[in-house]
Amino acid sequence: MSFNLRGAVLANVSGNSQDQLQETIVDAIQSGEEKMLPGLGVLFEVIWKNADENEKHEMLGTLEQGLKK
């Protein structure tokens, strides 16, 4: 039996408003549950694929700074 996690996550949030997406992200981060990490990864993949080069550079800078803390 094969389970498509990426597809399940995308189906679960497809059509959500910005507020709903923010709630999903904040809830996943605040819960601190390891099982939420793959879903956050799928959401980041969507962001990355839809970002232009400047946005990607900005995200990488933010990530780099966050990892230095």
Swiss-Prot record:
Key words, A-Z: Sporulation
Location of the protein in the cell: Spore core
Induction per the UniProt record: Expressed only in the forespore compartment of sporulating cells.
BP terms from Gene Ontology: asexual sporulation; sporulation resulting in formation of a cellular spore
Presence of keyword Cell membrane: no
InterPro entries per the UniProt record, alphabetical: SspI
Listed HAMAP family: SspI (MF_00669)
Similarity comment: family membership: Belongs to the SspI family.
Name of this chain's protein: Small, acid-soluble spore protein I
Organism: Bacillus mycoides (strain KBAB4)
